[in-house]
Design a protein with these regions (language model features):
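Double-stranded beta-helix
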Residues: 5, 83-85, 108-150
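Short strand-connecting beta-turns/loops that link adjacent beta-strands
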Residues: 38, 64, 114-116
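Short beta-strand His + acidic residue motifs that chelate non-heme Fe in jelly-roll/DSBH
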Residues: 57-60, 78-80, 101, 107-114
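A short, N-terminal "cap"/entry segment at the start of jelly-roll beta-barrel domains
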Residues: 1-43, 58, 91, 135-150
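Short, conserved beta-strand element in jelly-roll/cupin
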Residues: 47-51, 62-78, 82, 123-126
Length: 150
C-alpha cells in the first residue's frame, strides 16, 4: 500500500500530454500515466492513434513488462511471434477487444483500413516509464516480419 499522503486520485488530461509523433512512427502516441506525470507510478498508460492507412510500427518486444491493449475504435492488424521469431500469428483486432501481450512477445500493429482511423489504450504493467520497459527493436527483421503471408 502506498503511504497515506500519496493516496489521492490523479487525473491527467489529454491537453497536458500532447502527442508524440517520434516514439513509434507512424503511430501517434499520447503517454498519460508514467513517472513523468504521476509521482511513484508503477505503470505506463496512454493512447495510440493509427491514421487511415498507417503502416506497421517498428517490430519489437519488451523484456521487462507485459502489455495490455483495449481497442477503442477501428480495426488494427496485429502481427505477433515469440522472441525467437517462431509461432508467427496475424489477427485483425476490432473495437472492444482486450489484448494481452506477454513480455518477450514480438508485436507490431498497423491500421487495417485505408479510410478509417483506429485507436487503442495501452498499459505497460509494472514499469514506471518507457525506458524501463526494455524495448528490443528488431530493425533488420522488420520488413520480412510484417510482409503479408499467403
Amino acid at each position: 500500500m502506498v503511504p497515506y499522503d500519496k493516496q489521492e486520485v490523479v487525473v491527467v488530461r489529454q491537453k497536458q500530454i500532447g502527442v508524440d509523433l517520434n516514439f513509434e512512427p507512424p503511430l501517434r502516441v499520447g503517454f498519460g500515466i508514467s513517472d513523468a506525470t504521476i509521482d511513484g507510478a508503477k505503470a505506463v498508460m496512454g493512447r495510440t492513434v493509427l491514421v487511415p492507412g498507417a503502416e506497421a510500427n517498428q517490430t519489437h518486444y519488451h523484456t521487462n513488462n507485459d502489455v495490455c491493449w483495449y481497442i477503442m475504435s477501428g480495426n488494427i492488424r496485429c502481427i505477433s511471434a515469440r522472441s525467437d521469431m517462431t509461432a508467427r500469428k496475424e489477427i485483425i483486432l476490432a473495437a472492444g477487444d482486450f489484448v494481452y501481450v506477454p513480455s518477450g512477445s514480438i508485436h507490431v500493429i498497423a491500421n487495417a483500413s485505408d479510410t478509417e482511423e483506429a485507436s487503442l489504450i495501452f498499459c505497460y504493467i509494472g514499469v514506471p516509464n518507457v525506458e524501463a520497459s526494455g524495448f528490443v527493436w528488431l530493425t533488420k527483421e522488420h520488413d520480412e516480419f510484417v510482409r503479408p503471408r499467403p
